[in-house]
């Protein structure tokens, strides 16, 4: 099975890495700041509309192209500034797991990730079961 779509949106620049920690009764408590919760909810709302009827099974190849509003950059120019691709992917895979694209993001055995400046911002996603 192959799932392929484009989500027109301003991609979140806050990432999974930005979780916060506080200490309560001598124990660390991790929490998501409001900005991260908002980004996660926005992504969840977009992805829930596109989830498959049945979760992908077995090994999955995930391709994601992140298109950020170009500003003064050229359309299609690679984005070489933060956020890092691995942090973007962690949030994306967590949300894709939560809405039911697969059972566990450990199933993602192959990843292709790119980030660009673009005239039309959004996220291109292609997920496919590998034989």
State where each predicted segment sits.
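Acidic, proline/glycine-enriched N-terminal capping motif
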Residues: 1-131
């Amino acid at each position: 099975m192959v799932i392929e779509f484009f989500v027109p949106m301003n991609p979140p620049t806050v990432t999974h890495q930005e979780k916060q920690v506080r200490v309560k009764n001598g124990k660390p408590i991790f929490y998501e700041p409001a900005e991260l919760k908002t980004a996660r909810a926005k992504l969840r709302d977009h992805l829930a509309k596109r989830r498959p009827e049945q979760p992908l099974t077995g090994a999955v190849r995930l391709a994601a192209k992140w298109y950020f509003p170009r500003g003064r950059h050229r359309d299609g120019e690679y984005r070489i500034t933060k956020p890092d691709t691995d942090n973007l992917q962690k949030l994306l895979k967590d949300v894709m797991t939560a809405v039911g694209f697969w059972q566990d993001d450990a199933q993602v055995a192959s990843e292709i990730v790119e980030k660009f400046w673009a005239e039309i911002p959004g996220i291109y996603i292609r997920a496919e079961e590998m034989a």
